[in-house]
Design a protein with these regions (language model features):
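Bacterial N-terminal signal peptides that target proteins for export
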Residues: 1-11
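Extracellular/periplasmic carbohydrate-active domains that bind, remodel
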Residues: 16-318
């Protein structure tokens, strides 16, 4: 016979279990940054000790099997329990776009290579992003997050996209330039962003390698980048984070190292940049879109970085 006491105990268990689960989520460790201006602490994400190996979700190394779905399954599983590490083991892993979720640390073991495809259709459907300071819907960045918090890419692995198609797109033929003019016109006349569909026809607007859109508490730590279709790391309207110990080499057209656009409270340190364009850029949008969004960059410290090659060491508004 079920008593009232038994029912009450069961109710407590139902209430208490999810509280315990979420209590084991991401912790935020404040990091004081010495700066010549008042600056809030940035926060270092400390992720729970839960690992989700992509191999357990069907991923196979070797550079032949497309692992996009397996990686997405691992990210979703990790997200649903409150976060942890999605682990990319040693080996070469062929993939399309990787979309992060809140409380995810994409961790690459030493010897791990994420080899992104260069087939444009793999990066559809289009996502909300920006192109040279103007918001639009374009091909998904190779690694993308939108409106997430507590996200990281860490480890000693390498991000190394295939580049054959993107190199052809470097040429910026007439159709591409006409598409850009159309985007400028749409942005300057306040056409709604969802109507600025650019991943069509021969527009050839290349995707970013990493684009984090309106995210909070970001950590990029320790990995290497070898080549990029467009801007390499784009922190867009993000709040708070640490970028450290990166080794970035991308010598193609528009290959900025890191662009902080309309972002605040960031520490960039101990990174190495070898770029085909600017190394570090701080900017706040372009023309009408910039006024519409009205979000300045502020509280950014860049220190102890090496620039081997680049159009500028530090560009402001470039």
């Amino acid at each position: 016979m079920t008593t009232l006491k038994d029912l009450f105990a069961g109710l407590l268990l139902v209430i208490f279990f999810p509280i315990c689960s979420w209590a084991e989520g991401v912790k935020l460790q404040p990091v004081e940054v010495e700066a010549p201006f008042p600056m809030d602490s940035v926060f270092l994400c400390i992720f729970p000790q839960r690992d989700f190996l992509i191999t357990k979700y069907g991923a196979k190394a070797g550079g032949k099997k497309l692992n996009t779905k397996a990686i997405a399954k691992a990210i979703t599983a990790c997200h649903l329990v409150g976060g942890g590490r999605v682990v990319i083991p040693k080996g070469e892993w062929l993939t399309g776009p990787i979309h992060l979720k809140s409380n995810i640390n994409l961790y690459m073991e030493e010897g791990a290579v994420l080899r992104f495809t260069d087939t444009p259709s793999d990066y559809l459907p289009a996502v909300m992003t920006s192109w040279e300071g103007m918001e639009c819907y374009n091909y998904s960045p190779l690694i993308y997050a939108s409106d997430c918090e507590n996200i990281a890419i860490t480890g000693k692995g390498v991000l190394a996209p295939k580049m054959d198609t993107w190199r052809i797109w470097f040429a910026r033929p007439q159709a591409h330039m006409e598409a850009l003019r159309k985007l400028y016109t749409m942005a300057s006349t306040d056409v709604p962003v969802e109507e600025r569909q650019m991943a069509v026809g021969e527009n050839n607007l290349r995707p970013h390698l990493i684009h984090l859109n309106r995210c909070r508490n970001v950590l990029l730590d320790g990995f290497k980048i070898r080549e990029s279709p467009f801007w390499t790391i784009h922190l867009y309207m993000c709040k708070g984070g640490i970028v450290r110990g990166l080794d970035v080499k991308a010598n193609g057209h528009n290959n900025d190292g890191i662009d902080l656009e309309m972002s605040r409270n960031f520490l960039i340190e101990n990174c190495k940049f070898d770029q085909g364009d600017d190394a570090v850029v701080i900017k706040s949008g372009r023309n009408r879109d910039a006024w519409r969004l009205g979000t300045p960059c502020e509280n950014i410290v860049v220190r102890n970085c090496q620039v081997m090659e680049g159009h500028t060491l530090l560009g402001i508004g470039s």
